[in-house]
Amino acid sequence: MNLKDQIENPTRNKIIKELHKSPMKFIAVITGAGTTAISDIMSLPGSSKTVIEVLIPYSKESLEFFNSSPLNKHVSVIESKNMASSIYIKGKSYLDKNEKFIGIGCTAAISTIPQRKGEDRAHISICNGDIIKSVTINLSRKNRSRLEQERIVSDLIINLLAESFDIDLRMNLDLYDDEKIIIHN
């Protein structure tokens, strides 16, 4: 997929327009990758009906706020769950009790210099108060640039928002054979 197609994806724009029509809203904490999803959502009219708040902590110290105790490993499913539930609780503290919203936590490690040990990946969790759904995407280091990895993580966030908002549209992520999405219970 070329860069122009990545930016001007008509399905993405349709999903975002549907998100903006929904009575649901979201509050998010995103680190490492996935912030392009927020840019995409806010680039179309209606985002004030959808977005409550977005935080982008980037240092380990700022991420500790979302974890009840220091983690041995950042960029993990546990961290994304902690982020989603913490930001959901924060939203509950100041929103009307009848407000319908979800909390999103995304933590990612994508292509960098120098190359890190371990896989390029993202963990995304969505909390609606009762349930936390989490997914992991393992990304291709050899086939994707950092920009392409950011795009894939962002599109996955938008797809998960669509699912959470009961919108039937999804983008095809065009994953390579060495990439996979894992759904956690």
Where are the language model's segments positioned?
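Flexible inter-domain linker/hinge segments
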Residues: 171-185
